[in-house]
Amino acid sequence: MNSTIAKLADEFEKMEKTIASQKKMIETLMPTGYVDTDTVKLHLNSVYGVMFGSRPSPKRCKLEDCSWDEINMYSSFGLADKMFEVGDTKKFRLADGSYLTARIIGFNHDYASDGSLVHITFETVETLDGDIPMNEKPTNEGGWDASYLRAKLNGNFFEKQLPADLKAVIKPVVKMTAKSKNEVRVSSVDKLFVLSEQEVFGRKIYSCGYEGKWYEWYKRENTSYGKCKQNGERDWRWERSPHSGDTTSFRSVDTNGSADGDNASVSCGVSFGFCI
């Protein structure tokens, strides 16, 4: 009897969460023009599907005005590319008191380890004020997956510096990267990552290639590939791609936005990506 009651209680809890989630979606979307009363009646029992048909173009949201929880909600409902645009930005505060700006660089681009699509990819507009080496020694052995920078970003930096509301909605995604100068690719599952040469420039230049696809933001005409630190100083920045011709360096982007490379033990700027 107790087990039956427990099962029923569990089912009721799931139903309450579903109803609350649907209610939140409807209340949020009603002012945007995406959902009206008829749509609600027709689709309330669907799996959060909203059929737009030939409805007028809805109002887009200003990313800066949305909480990370709201952004995550739109992403979870598959509405991210309807509510926001590539290039939209949102500032957030790190635990050290400094600020970074996150920019949407692509929709429906990255995948979770279970193969499901993760709908929004962000990259920080600025590099961190403090430069970081890719590795403590001058080697690219093991590639991004085995690097010091990857461990730092996904460990202490993620846990200690990012705001709790942002950490709560970041979804780990699979990133492919060459293991070293050879053609072997390995996958890593990352909460935070730096882009590959191909994700920035759309092709391999001095990397091994096949390390992800070109992000929409970087496809656009007149997009500046160069970046500045949080303090405004022009900065080099790391890419996660090992140099295809040696065992000591990784690819980077110089202050002018051109493809370059640096010894793995050199400290360079870090502009990181994440997905929601």
What are these regions (language model features)?
Residues 12, 27-28, 245, 256:
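Intrinsically disordered, low-complexity segments enriched in polar/charged small residues
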